[in-house]
Regions:
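Glycine-rich FAD pyrophosphate-binding loop
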Residues: 59-86, 257-264
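N-terminal Rossmann-like FAD-binding beta1-loop-alpha1 element of flavoenzymes
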Residues: 39-68, 245-246
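Glycine-rich dinucleotide-binding loop and its adjacent helix/turn
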Residues: 122, 128-135, 141, 184, ...
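Glycine-rich active-site loop/strand segments that organize a redox cofactor
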Residues: 72-138, 331-337, 382-401, 405
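A Rossmann-like FAD-binding core segment of flavoenzymes
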Residues: 153, 157, 165, 169, ...
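Short hydrophobic core segments
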Residues: 45, 186-198, 234-236, 299-307
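C-terminal, flexible cofactor-proximal segment of oxidoreductases
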Residues: 341-479
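Feature captures the FAD/FMN-dependent oxidoreductase FAD-binding
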Residues: 118, 122-190, 195, 199
């Protein structure tokens, strides 16, 4: 595959054979259908990775769609738009970003890019936060997307004009964050929700949690490990964020207690001051926690790495229901069962967010412009019921309702088949499987390697020169 470097942009140029393959999904009939159709106005709520994906697909030259994106903050990028602010901005809203200083990706750059727009080959396999944000900036500039975004604007309400009508239009009410008393309402043919899945922290109601006199925070408010120098800190939760925060704190804290209820982790923490406690928390006291095995651990601080909750404050509960972190009723986790004009591109966990959200947006676009081949409502309801049954039988409920991992590839193929576009490359799946295995075996060091794919569809991990990169940098977490 060839590439062209132009003013810092990497534009992927596909071979003719690949182009021909792509064109079989884009027939002359579909082009003419969208070109002749009346203009449709689509609201996009949020401009993180998913919102940028939506804007790119909605602005295809083959069609008459006018997108309007609403972004609460002053910049696009969501998580990747770093801010040192930990709690609230000047208008009382939480920051869009949960990223901390010096952060790196925990996925290779091949899984952190949009189709057809690659990262600079000079970057390490696991880039820094600043590299990722610069990539998003180049992409938005190259695709000329910023002109569609209303910054510092919050959506307060989205209601169907004709409740129960699958093709209803929507009334979207919004206001400037600086003056919520003055609002405006516009009508849209469709709404695509991209408000993120790492915005609203989940803090379990442990008995006695309000009695703790030390520092208690969620990982979303965590910024610098240096703040905990010489302290005894409990990190609650052992998913990506829990293990990473424990690793970073180990450079500064006296002792780090990694408490969780999962299987013992395989990672070896090099500093020797990370103490794993795979027991649940029975009680939190003024200066300690009591584990389920009865052991009491005295602490200065607690960092809750306990995930996030889904929330859609601009929708009524009769439109979107959230029960035990299961967002319903959605077909394929993206299309509302009752409204073919309402989409959610923000739910999936443990996926390659960039390419997956891009193809979710392509699917939404195909439904909006009428090129998608959708099942009947009854068939979609049956599909939802089958998946609920399967996930219930396989212990994938609660925070796992929208969890994908290796399921994401078949999921993407189904969307591509219905939307009549090309599914994601097999190469991405190879990268995914490799990094998942590498990360599990060596969580503290895997980011120090560069990945090189050879002609046999296998990947070689090559250790980077330690003098090329700063040591002990944290990396991006998929939650």
């Amino acid at each position: 595959m060839a590439s062209i470097i132009m003013t810092g942009r990497i534009l992927c140029i596909k071979p003719l054979q690949s182009v021909v393959k792509s064109l079989r999904y884009a027939t002359t009939a579909s082009f003419s259908r969208t070109a002749d159709a009346p203009e449709k106005k689509v609201a996009v709520i949020g401009t993180g990775v998913s919102g940028i994906s939506a804007l790119k697909n909605l602005t295809s030259p083959f069609g008459n769609i006018k997108p309007v994106a609403f972004e609460r903050s002053a910049s696009f990028g969501g998580h990747w738009s770093f801010t040192s602010n930990k709690t609230r901005d000047e208008f009382g809203y939480p920051p869009s970003s949960a990223i901390y200083c010096g952060l790196r990706t925990n996925l290779p750059r091949e899984l952190m890019s949009f189709p057809g727009f690659e990262h600079d080959d000079n970057l390490p396999t696991f880039p820094k936060q600043s590299d990722i944000y610069e990539y998003l900036q180049r992409y938005v500039d190259y695709c000329d997307l910023e002109k569609y975004i209303k910054f510092n604007t919050i959506v307060t309400n989205a209601v169907p004009r004709s409740p129960g009508d699958a093709k209803t239009k929507w009334e979207v009410t919004y206001c400037d964050v600086s003056d919520p008393t003055k609002s405006s309402t516009e009508e849209f043919d469709a709404v695509i929700i991209c408000n993120g899945n790492c915005v609203f922290p989940n803090v379990p109601p442990f008995p006695g949690i309000d009695a703790f006199q030390g520092r208690l925070l969620h990982s979303r408010d965590y910024r610098q490990a240096e703040e905990f120098k010489g302290q005894n800190v409990a990190v609650v939760g052992s998913s990506y964020s829990g293990k990473d925060v424990a690793r970073q704190l180990s450079d500064f804290a006296d002792k780090v207690y990694l408490t969780h209820i999962d299987e013992p982790i395989k990672t070896v923490y090099e500093n020797g001051n990370v103490i794993e406690k795979n027991f649940g928390i029975r009680e939190i006291k003024e200066s300690s926690i009591v584990l389920e095995n009865g052991k009491e651990v005295h602490l200065d601080a607690i960092v809750m790495c306990t995930g996030y909750k889904y929330q859609f404050p601009f929708l009524s509960e009769d439109i979107i229901s959230i029960q035990n972190e299961h967002v319903t009723p959605l077909y394929k986790h993206v299309l509302h069962l009752d409204y073919n004009s309402l989409f959610v591109i923000t739910l999936l966990r443990n996926v390659a967010t960039y390419p997956i959200s891009f193809n979710q947006a392509r699917f939404a676009r195909s439904v909006i412009d009428g090129t998608a081949n959708l099942p009947s409502k009854a068939e979609m309801a049956e599909d939802i019921a089958r998946e609920v049954k399967w996930r219930s039988e396989n212990n994938m409920t609660g925070p796992m309702w929208h969890y994908m991992d290796t399921l994401q590839w078949n999921y993407d193929s189904h969307l591509a088949d219905m939307g009549k576009f090309e599914p994601l490359s097999e190469m991405l799946q190879i990268y995914w499987n490799f990094v998942e295995n590498h990360r599990e075996k060596d969580f503290c060091n895997y980011w120090k390697y560069d990945y090189v794919m050879n002609g046999k569809k296998t990947i070689e991990a090559i250790k980077r020169d330690e003098h090329q990169e700063e040591e002990h940098l944290p990396y991006r977490l998929v939650v």
